């Protein structure tokens, strides 16, 4: 999902969060895939979320793509969500 609205209860089920000083979409998806999670999400530049799916199986509401324009902590050519905005990746 290009840009989702997150909330304090989180949108990814059974989520764990890692704060990565070198966060990028690639770093986060690699971390989550290595832990056998089905989903990864980047948020607020340095946050990486791994989850088993969407909470209650419900896709979170979409946000404007421009809301996910915070630069990643690990690469200034990549975007890593925004404030309460998450870019979500699903492994196939």
Sequence positions of predicted segments:
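Peripheral, non-catalytic regulatory segments
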Residues: 1-92
